[in-house]
Each structure stands twice: as structure tokens, then as C-alpha cells.
């Protein structure tokens, strides 16, 4: 391990070194290429000769020992007045010894680069090149000091060895081209070239824009020639990390990681993630929020899978049978005479009427009858004669007429030809009557009938009377409907209700019917009157609607159809785009935040130099920082408008400031200072020096001649005139003829002609330096001559398909329809203007809206009145047609003024005993009060604070808990609880109320009153017994109804639901009666005896096998950890069903939804482990008891469901200590015990 750690250390050091090298990479380079140096006299700046031989030029010139010349370069910040002292803040460099007094090097450019490449290939270094790297934003302005020195084997600078010092303060932009500089000093003439280049992946005029192309998690972009990130297709954002989602994708419920997709959040779906996911398994329902299941019409149940109108959806009854909806997914057929079966599919005595003609014989079959025809006849009743028309030669439904040796086709109107094979356009004759349109078909035509009509020509009124009316009611056919005229004493849509005075709901408009001895009395709601509340008080007389709106009188209310310019209940409020100022204002300075972001996100509309201020109506204005102006604060105020720089200086505009770049010969902040070129004295005491602009003049003494009084013979030499000027000797003086672009006595002053005409466009400023120039571009422009407009639309700032319009240092988003905001991130809420009529709900959509209409209204804006269903009243509260509500433990719904409620006896409601008197009375229904519960009703203490609402007795029934009574109208449920999971303070009454409130309990109590009574079970302290019965109990031929109710309640309990009480249930036992006929005879006893013999044989075989295996293990004497242990657990067996007339049977089921209850670690486990250590005599005794139990079986049907919330399926069992034995002969302790055992 230590060696491995020592191996890791070098790797870590190498990694840190690599990271340091990467971080230390420069942003750019300043390069200087020396081309030539000419020191004609071989002298130093002090006038002495090189190599310190003591001679001076004043004494007559230097000897043949030339200077050993090398160059030092110092780069520092821009100085209006250059000072040679001080640090080289930008960097410094030096060359080796390059030559003697004068030398030439390959110039910069293509030819020079090739020469230097050949030198490097030969192993030589480029001697005249000085490269100074920098790791900061290049400021473009700089000061360059170049010094030529004489090498004298001394590493310390010595001013006495200085040959020449020249300086240049100017501006240069990064580019590949070289910029030439010429210097004529006091002693030497220097020619050099400079340039600035950005390092790889660095761009802009300051080399501080870093851009490295990438296509990974951190970005998806390339780099253009200006270093701008160009997002790849489908990506956007500052770093091109945000994928462009599908247009219209709801960013509140979805997003994307791949361009063009729209990935929905959990619970949402659809193309734009704007559709919620319904509850799993929801069949005929929809949702508004995720995991809902709102049922469609005629569907019910938790998953909307219960067909409430099975007859109307499936039409199961055949042969004219009448279908009646019994309960969800159930129906009953009332068959006509001569038919029977569940669907009236069986015909009875079909051959009695001799249906077979021409001597055919009739045979009855389950579906009716069949005719066996004699030779020469065919058909269902042997009525068809076989002839030439038997092959159906006539097409298109033509009628074949048999003739002698032939046939004739009588074609329908739609067809013509010998065999009716040619089609005719039947729609020309307009055959369709009550139809939307006529469509010509091949071989006929089709009439698109209006609802309520049928037939080929839509001329037959659909007979909607199909036996729906019961109890002798007369059905009256209507167009697309029917009406039942009921006989006296019956009512309802199908005359299915037995009428009393109030059963037919005689009171209209939601009136409450009061049954009286001699009739009834209607208590009308507000807005109605009359004996039957049939008189609707016309609230439209006089009309309350304003501004010309039409008034509609509704049920107890009115509705005003407002014009487009007004709204409100009475159309008295002018409609505004933002009524009451409650509309959401589109903030021009912000955008909607995306998921996980704060409320608003800055849009950046004012750029980096302004602050956005919102204005009314979604507008904005920008408050600019000092030095900026413009609508978007995108324009830098030009501080050079007053031309503050003097003497031809170039003014460079900066942020709220300016800078002057002076021409040669001038310095200072405003270029108003002429530096003294006579310092140090260039005349070397041979004459008097006069200062000029970027030059000097020596008035020589004692016969000395030349520019610096250095010659006795000539005024001119090769270096008298600078920059290529031609020298003319005039005897006592000289004259220089300057080339274009230069002026002055020695051609040392540049005319700045490189900026004439101005090469910089779009407001750029040209800074000349001899024959070269540099452009300083205004914000928003870039390039060598400021020709490229900076792309402010990159990276893409516009969302949802918005188009970005690039300006000069600004951008604008043109949004797609339905979107707004500076970056098109706001989905325009078309509901802000309240386009929907009063009372309707507006739902915003992309580039539109949708109106959700209240009942009785329709139209695009819910402005059309189509009528209302009647409301229902419950306890003084009105409920509109189609609505649902809960009363106590029952669920109710309103069906056109009729209350349809489940019939569950809600029993005694739990209540708190302690508290204020008014609070105690409010817990119980009217007329009841909170009383102390009966003793022994607490399932898990403390329960002293809980009581029960009294004064309501249950219906009289013999089906009581702990009574042992079972019949066709009585079932008994025994619920076993895990007391550790039962909440404290739980009483038997609370459990009973929870079961009564189950949706499944309400569903089985539609036709009869369902009574549930609870008490502590005698089988254990953690068990509750529930007695289930219907009231009244008459007309129950068998126990199927009570069995169905019991099993539905048990199924709901096993699903647990959201009740903490039901989660604590570990086992449910169901007991119902099973009736049998006397026709069984001796079959049951014989079967019981045979089963008993087989069971005893199995027991004997198991005992023998167990002993044999035990002996084998004792002989083998294997170690304990190597012995096999069979972990197979026996299933709960079905006990011997003993069936006899009027008796009962006891059957045991294992509930797969439940798991066995948890047990203590020291408690013996059921199954093999729990019986491993049982002695052999104890096993025999248990077997004997099992036989006795089977003979003492009672007559109750018992279904047992068990579960264990405390053990997970994957947890290993804890086996008890002792020798390991075969487990297959051991009975599970979960085997059923017969109820009622003595």
C-alpha cells in the first residue's frame, strides 16, 4: 500500500504541473524583428569609442576595433512623455551579439520568414527576433524603448557602454502583418519591425476573448474569425448549453436536453407537455391535474371503468328483450313471450307454429328452430324454389325473375344494365329528405341523416321506444328521443319508480316536497312560485341588463349576453384589456423565469452599460451609465468631438474620457510639449545644438561638418537624411529631399499620410505610424478597418422561435405569434382581456384561448344559452344538475332535479367528549349529542376522550355482531389488526365509520339500505367483528346479494386506500351462508368420506416419511451447516367442504395482497422452523386433533385473508434452534380453524 501511495505521488505532481502549465499559457505575444543597425563612426552615445581604447571621435575617429553590438528591448505602458527609467511593466527581452558597427538581418515578411526557417532548420536561432509574451488584456497602446549596447564581457548594465537609445509610444492592434519603424538617433540608425499576435484560442483587439470550439456537456459551438461563439444548430444561450426546445413546449411542465424535443416532467404528457397524465388504469376519464380520473358521462368507479349505462352501450338483450341497468357493469333482460336466457337468446317451443313450408320438418335448437327441407326447396322455412336465379346473377341488389331458359334482372334505381352492373348518380334526384348531405356511391348513394332519422332516404323517424317503459307505461316516440306516459301510481323516466305523493318529484325548479296526509306541499326556492314551483319569476322584467344586452331568464337567475365592449353581471362594466388593473403586465425589463428560476430573469435589453426601468403598457426605458447614450445605452459618447489633441495628435475616445496619441516630436497629455532632442548633446561639443520638432541642428565649430559635426570633409553621408531622404552638400550646410510621407530638416517627421484618406470606416479612428496604421473601432464594430458588425445575436438570445434582429451594439427579438417579452420567453395570456362571457372560465393556450362554459351555455365564448337541467336541494343547499356531493357517509348526485344517493346506514358518528358545549353539539347531527361509548369498545388506548353521537337506533335486524346468526341477508366479517400500527385512541366505532365511508360500501347500497354494525370479536383483543345486512330483508331468494356486498367491502379493505386504520389490518375473515337443494342426496356424505380416507392416508405417509428422513440424518451425522433445510411453506389448504341441505361450508383463502404480521425474534415461526423441535409424540397428538377438527366442522362459509406489513419478501427467515428436519409434513399455523368449533 505504501509503495502504491509512493507511485501515486509523482502522477499527482505531473497532473498539477500540467494544470500549472495550462494556466500559465500567455494570451499573446509582442514580437520585435531587428532589420538593420548602422553606427558609421563606431562610437558610443557618450562620444567615446567602443571597447574603451580611450580615443574619441573628437580626436579623429575610432580605430578598426568595432563595437560588439547587441540590443535590449523594454516594453511598458503608454507614456505621454517617455521616461527611459522605471520597470518594463509589459516585459523585456534581449538579443545576442548581432555584429559590429553596422549589420543587416533578414527583414520580417515572407522572405525573411523563409530565411529564418532555414536558419532554424540548421540548428541556429533567429538572432534578431525578440518575443515578449503577455498574460493580460493587450491595451493596444504601449511604449517601446530599444537600446543598442556594446558587449564588454560585463553582465551588469553600464551607461558608458550604451551605443543608442530610441523610443516609440503608439498603438498597435493584434494582427499577422508587421509594422516598420525607423529611428535616426544621435549616433546610430535602427530599422526594426513589430507586431502583436494573440495566442491560439484568443481573439479581439485586446486578446482577452477566449474561444475554444467544443461540442460536449459544457457547450456546443464553434469560433469565428473574431472569437465569437457560433452556436451549433439547435443550441442557444451564453455558452450554447441550452437546447432549443420544440416551439410551444410548455417550460413549466417540460423542457429538453436535445434540440427539437420536448421532454415532459413527471405527470405531464403530450406534444407540448401541456396534457396531464390521468390516474393509472383510468379507462373512461380525463384529468385537469396529474393523477386525476374524472369520469365521462355514464361511467363511474375509481378508474371510470364501471359502465353505468350498460344497456345503452352494449344492447345485450336479443329477440326484443327489454334491458334494465341493474348496477355498474350489470344488467337484466326482460324477455318477451317465447324467449328466455340471460340475453333472451333461447327460444321456447319454436316448432309449435309449424314454420317450415312445403313439407319441411321442424327441429328445435337452442337458438330457435331449423327446417330440414325436401328436395327442390331451400331457405330457412323451405319457401325458396331453386331456379336459374339461385346463382344471383344480378349485381347491385337487382331482382332476378326466373324465366324459361333464362332470367331477367329488375335493377334498383341506382343501377342499370343487363345485370345491373352500371352505376347511376342517384343524388341528382335529391332523394335524401332529413339529411345533412347526399353522397353518391358506387352502386348507390348515402344520406347523412340528421339525428333522430334513419332509412335510406332519412325518411323514417327512429323509433326510440324499445320497451323502456315499465309497469304498463306507454312509450311515446319523439324525434331522437322518447317519453314514457306512466300509469297512475308510477313515475320516473321509465316508470320504474313506485309513486307516492313526493316520489315523482312534483315540485319543479328544485323545490322541496313535503308529504302530507291528503297530498303534498312544495317549498319553492327563491325566484319560483306556484303550487308546483313551476312559475319562474321573470327576473328579466324589467331587464337588468345594460348597454343593449339581451336578458335570458334562467332557473332562479338571469344571464346578460353582453356586447364585446362591456362585461360584468349586468354588462355595465366597460371591457378593458386589463380590467381593474388585475391583468398581468408584460414587463419590458424582465422575462418569465424557467423551471427552478426566480420569478423574473433580466432580459439584458439595455446591454451592459444601462439599467432598465419598466414603463406602463409593457414599455421600458434605459438609464445609461456615465459616458453612454442611445435607446439601449449602446452608444459611447464621443469625447473627441472638441478635438482636444494639438499639433496633429490623434484623439482616441474612451468611456467618459479620451487619450491623445502624439506624432513624432510631440508629447504630453494633449501633445503640446516638444521634447528636447538635444539631450544628450548630439554635437559632441564640436558645435552648438538647436532643438527642432523630432530633430536637432548642430552649428559646427572649427571646420567640422555633418549632421553631428563628425566629419572634416563632407556634410553628407549615408545616414544624414532619415527615412530614405536624399542629402545635398551645400558647402557650409546640407539639405535633405524627403520622400512622400516625411518632412523635416532630416526627413524624421512623419506626415501621417498612412491615414489619408481615412481607412477606418464606421466611425473608427485611425492612428498612423509612418507607413502603417491601426484602427480604433467604435463599440459594435471590429476588424482591421472596422468593417465587421459584431453579431449581438450570438449566442441566440430569443426563445420560442423568435427571430433576432442584429443592430450596432444592440439586438431586438421579433417574437412568434403568441409570445412576447424582450426575449420572447413570455407566453401571452390571451385571457387577460376576459374574452369569455360572464361566468365562463378562460383557459389560455398558445396564440389563443379556450372558454370552458358553465352548464346551460355554449359557443366559442360561452355566449349562447342552451338551457339548464334542474337543480337539487340538500339540507338547504342547492346543487346544480350533474353535480355530486357527500352526505354523511353516503354519496349523492343530482339528475335533473332528482337526488340519487347511496343507502348506507351511517350509524353512530365518533365525537370528542371534551370541549366547549357549542363545539360538542356541532360534532353530531341535529337532534343528537355526544355520549360516552359503551365499555370495551377501545381497540388501542387511550380512548377516554372519544364518544359516540347517540339518539339514532339502527334498523331492526337479527344480524348482529357476536350473535352467530347467518342467513340470506346476513354476513359476518372479522378484521384482525396489528395493534402496533393502529393509531392511539382508535375505537370500534371509528373503524365502523371508516368502513361505512368506503366508496365500495356506497356502491353496493344503491337499491336497499345497507346496515353495518361492529363490536369487539370474541376471537381476540385486536379483532373487530362486522355484521353486514340489508333493510328491508324481504324478497331475497338467496344469499347472492349479501355475498356480493361482503366481498366488495373486503376487496376495498385489502386495497387499503388512504386510511391509516385499514393499513393496520392483517387478516380478514368472511362468513356467509351457502344454501343447497335436497337433490344432493347421499353425494355429500360419500364425497366427505372419500376425502377423509385420502386425508388420513396422506397423514400416515407424511409421518412415515418424516421418521425415515430423521433416521437418515442421524446416520449421516453431517455438520449442522452442511445439512439441507427445505424452506417450502405449505399453502393454506381448502378444508373438507361438508355440504348438506340448508347447511354451510367453510372455505379458507389466502389474500395475496397481504403479508404475514411481524413476530418477535424469540417467537417460534410458523411453518417448518416453528415445528422443527417438536417431539414425535406431539406430532401424533396434533394429527389426532386435526382429525377431530375435521369431524367437528360447522356449517359456515369462511374466507380468510392474511397479510403481514412487517416483513419484506426478500428478508431471510430466522430459524429456530434445534435439529433440522423435513418440513413438508408440518402444517402451517395459518391453516383455517372451522368457525363455531365446540
Swiss-Prot record:
Biased segments, Basic and acidic residues type: 1114-1123, 1183-1206
Transmembrane segments annotated in the record for this chain: 1081-1101
Membrane topology summary: Single-pass type I membrane protein
Start and end residues of each VWFC domain: 870-944
Effect of residue 682 to S: In LGMDR27; uncertain significance
GO function terms (MF aspect): calcium ion binding; growth factor activity; Notch binding
Localization per Swiss-Prot or TrEMBL: Membrane
Disulfide bonds: 198-207, 211-223, 231-240, 245-256, 249-262, 264-273, 276-287, 282-293, 295-304, 311-323, 317-333, 335-344, 351-362, 356-371, 373-382, 389-400, 394-409, 411-420, 427-438, 432-447, 449-458, 465-475, 469-484, 486-495, 502-513, 507-522, 524-533, 540-551, 545-560, 562-571, 589-612, 606-622, 624-633, 640-651, 645-660, 662-671, 678-689, 683-698, 700-709, 716-727, 721-736, 738-747, 755-766, 760-775, 777-786, 793-804, 798-813, 815-824, 831-842, 836-851, 853-862
Pfam families recorded: DSL, EGF, EGF_CA, EGF_DL_JAG, hEGF, JAG1, MNNL
Ranges of residues in domain DSL: 196-240
EGF-like domain residues: 241-274, 275-305, 307-345, 347-383, 385-421, 423-459, 461-496, 498-534, 536-572, 574-634, 636-672, 674-710, 712-748, 751-787, 789-825, 827-863
Record's protein name: Protein jagged-2
Organism: Homo sapiens
